A protein has these predicted regions:
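N-terminal acidic leader/helix
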Residues: 1-24
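Generic N-terminal initiation segments characterized by hydrophobic and/or small/turn-forming residues
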Residues: 5, 56-59, 67
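Surface/interface-facing alpha-helical segments and adjacent flexible terminal/loop regions used
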Residues: 6, 80-83
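Generic structural concept
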Residues: 9-12, 33, 67
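Amphipathic, hydrophobic secondary-structure cores in small proteins
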Residues: 16-62
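Juxtamembrane/interface motifs at transmembrane-helix termini
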Residues: 47, 66-69, 81-82
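C-terminal structural segments of small proteins and small subunits
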Residues: 61-76
Length: 83
């Protein structure tokens, strides 16, 4: 894992740790995913999704779920723009 990807994994885990205090798991996942979608550069988002697709080493459970959701939304959006 490159140092850049390690940094992204750490940031995703830190963000999910913050949202882990939500009483509902779905809210924690949504909060993490929304934060990444709003505040991360598109290149960073593509890198973390690619890392997840390669196995997602180091991603915590909430961060992994958030990146999976982000990847699903990105796939839906690109499918909509190409049709």
């Amino acid at each position: 894992m490159s140092s850049n990807v390690e940094s992204l994994v750490k940031m995703a885990n830190d963000i999910s740790d913050y949202f882990a205090s939500e009483p509902d798991r779905a809210s924690a996942v949504d909060g993490t995913m929304t934060h990444i979608r709003r505040f991360w550069d598109p290149r960073m988002r593509r890198q973390i999704v690619a890392h997840l697709e390669a196995g997602g080493e180091g991603l915590g459970e909430l961060a992994r779920a958030a990146v999976q959701k982000l990847a699903g939304q990105a796939g839906t959006q690109s499918a909509q723009t190409t049709s």
